[in-house]
Amino acid sequence: MKLTPIMAAVAAALMALSGCSKQTGVGGTASEATATTQAANAQLAKELKLDDPQDFEDAKRGFMARPTGKIMADDGSVLHDFDAYQFVTGQAPDTVNPSLWRQARLNAEIGLFKVTDGIYQLRGFDIANITLIEGKTGWIVVDALTSRESAAAAMAFARQQLGDKPVTALVFTHSHIDHFGGALGIVSPKDVADRQVPVVASNGFMEEATSENVMVGTAMGRRSSYQFGRDLPRSAKGNVDTGLGKNVVYGTFGILTPTKLITQPTEELVLDGVRFVFHNVPGAEAPAEMTFSIPDKKAYGGAENLAQTMHNLLPVRGAKVRDALRWSSYMDQALDQMDGIEVYFGQHNWPVWGHDRISQFIKTHRDVYKYTHDQTVRLINAGLTPREIADTIKLPKSLSEHFGARGYYGALRHNVKAVYQFYLGAYDGNPANLDPLPPQESAKHYLALIGGSDKAVAAAQTAYDKGDYRWAAELLSHAVFGDPANKAAKELLANTYEQMGYAAEAATWRNSYLTAAAELRNGPPTKGISRAGFIEMLM
């Protein structure tokens, strides 16, 4: 295979990032939850109806079989352990936000599920779901997970339970890698060509898959290891969930070129005897995305436009900022597409059954994004900065009481800043921030003003003891950047990040805080993104 200039640049970057780091950590083990953290988690538990059974009934509905064991890489390493999250049961421990713990328990309901007659889902093989729709001669597969290994394991498990039928169509709902990266574990390029298997995607799919996942894939990969807690232990002091599912399987990534693009706003297509009505929804959760209904089965596939969590308008891993107003408008359109629909299923989390419940589910999400947008815009025009707005806006109880709209993957404060960035960019209007010093230089000046890093650590310890973790983290960030040799600063910053992670409702925030703490203690990863992991996507 001859590498194009883009492929060559990516390969070079991957090689550069695969080198070993020589930095070392300060050692130690993860801290316990402080009294302040325990009190914050206990207060939230009192405010929420954590024992509401509806989601648990839905997450278990249609269960057929559960996988066990591990998904292995070609080199013998473990990519995914189906039993790694068995500790997620019962009441929340002190070190996990109780609302997030509830979500983690729900996402721990993994396996093969029957959604309705002729529609099945595989959950827990990766962060996303595979949906199987029974056609006249085989399986219409919706989405392909993140890696070849996880997709192949899911399909093998499905065939064990449902019979060995061929793949007769593959549908990519959108251009994020956790929905197409395992394509070569679903069907081979030769099979697509020889049997003329339709590969269906939305208009602009290949361009967007390339721009988001290849052009900045190296940086995004490093940041995603924070967002998803890739290297954290699966434990009550580590990775308990991602909000959208249990785990991302970092195996071998690939892609298949679509043979059929959905180019119209609404377009009907018959795949292996099943009538689909596709709806393009570009520029919402992904730059290229589509939802669909299957009228004869009274079913609606919402892709990732809707999930059992507030989504993010700008992921922690980085991406193009998403349009909250457009996203909410697509949900209005979805309500108009619900005629006769009795089951909603997405490509993450669990389904919703019943027409009225589905309508309420969609309305709640629509209103969350519209409220976030409108209130942010109002405060922008009142002259507030991104951080000020993020500290001001709260969801009304009429929205926050719905668990499916709480911030397990997205976070309201982060989304508010995304709306600001969407309209005004990263600059907050303060001229001091037009050309600020780099973090290391700024930190050295702050430390000189304070009287040295030891005094900064002492002040941070006082803040930590009071439970003022945000201020402690700010002080200690200066101490670590300005004096990287100060082990006390790193150790206290690790403790601080752990408390912030233990109290975080968003799994993405928890994973980011705890990954940072782990790297302060143990040093950064000894290797970066594998060049081999991307090779099939570059072909």
Tell where the protein language model's regions lie, with residue ranges.
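Divalent-metal (often Zn2+) His-rich catalytic cores of metallo-beta-lactamase-fold enzymes
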Residues: 29-48, 299, 309, 325-388, ...
